[in-house]
Amino acid sequence: MKYSIPMKIPNQYQTNCLLKEITTFGIGGPAKYFVEVRTIPDMQKTLLFCYQNEIPYFILGKGSNSLFDDRGFNGLVIANRIDCLEKNEKGCWHVGAGYSFSLLGSQTARQGWEGLEFASGIPGSVGGAIFMNAGANGRETADNLISVDFVDEQGKLIHFKRSNLNFQYRTSPFQNIKGAIVSATFQLNASQEARQKQLSIIDYRKKTQPYKAKSAGCVFRNPNCGHAGALIEQAGLKETKIGGAAVSSVHANFIINSGLATSQDVLALIRLIQETVKAKTGAELESEIRYVPYDVNQG
């Protein structure tokens, strides 16, 4: 696909931005175009621009849970930097989709509000957490969500009430809608125990996960028959390597970039894990990492 972006795009953009430098996996070639969007009106203009000019785009939050192709991305990567934060005395928090989900979890707990403690340590944005319905410790992002503001592919701003959205385990309706989550509102409850819960969660996460390694977070959804990490370990795959990609020695549901890993290394390791776990345990593991091909029109 050959195209160029005229200068009327609402934000200053970069060309050939290395995606490995802005993702937690540390993998990915250059994006043909890259832009940071900091306001909802600019997101509306940017998505409408892409729609009118038939330019493929990818919405990026904090760069976790995404695996870009080694060749990069033949389109526009839109980094969501909408990071507003407002709250009232009743525990209603309105937050931009580009805000750190981990920071939101620690801030709310520190101020005595319960409901998002589990977010502490999850390396993604609020928008990404809603998109994937991220969760841990028996809680999910959707549990305390009351509304989501979304910009569709034609730049229209839509307000969704939680009651009209169908969330399931690690899935949201936004995975099937073109556009971008731009903000959300959470209803939290006052709790004197919130801070201690949050500190316990982050302490446990640091001890049981490869906290500082280059990874995209948990690779597989937990199947009905058990925890993905335990099944992978049961299959004898802990520390298995393909190229620079390796199954973590700390937590088997993490693939880490142990060196100069490529996207193909990671994809090959994912397939190996799925095939081996299926053969040895009968369980089918479904990846929750979003692989982004170079050309989205070819897959």
UniProtKB/Swiss-Prot annotation:
GO terms for biological process: cell division; cell wall organization; peptidoglycan biosynthetic process; regulation of cell shape. It is found in: Cytoplasm. InterPro entries: FAD-bd_PCMH (IPR016166), FAD-bd_PCMH-like_sf (IPR036318), FAD-bd_PCMH_sub1 (IPR016167), FAD-bd_PCMH_sub2 (IPR016169), MurB (IPR003170), MurB_C (IPR011601), MurB_C_sf (IPR036635), Oxid_FAD_bind_N (IPR006094). Its cofactor is FAD. The keyword rRNA-binding does not apply. Transmembrane segments: none annotated. Its EC number is 1.3.1.98. Belongs to the MurB family. This is UDP-N-acetylenolpyruvoylglucosamine reductase. It comes from Protochlamydia amoebophila (strain UWE25). The gene is murB.
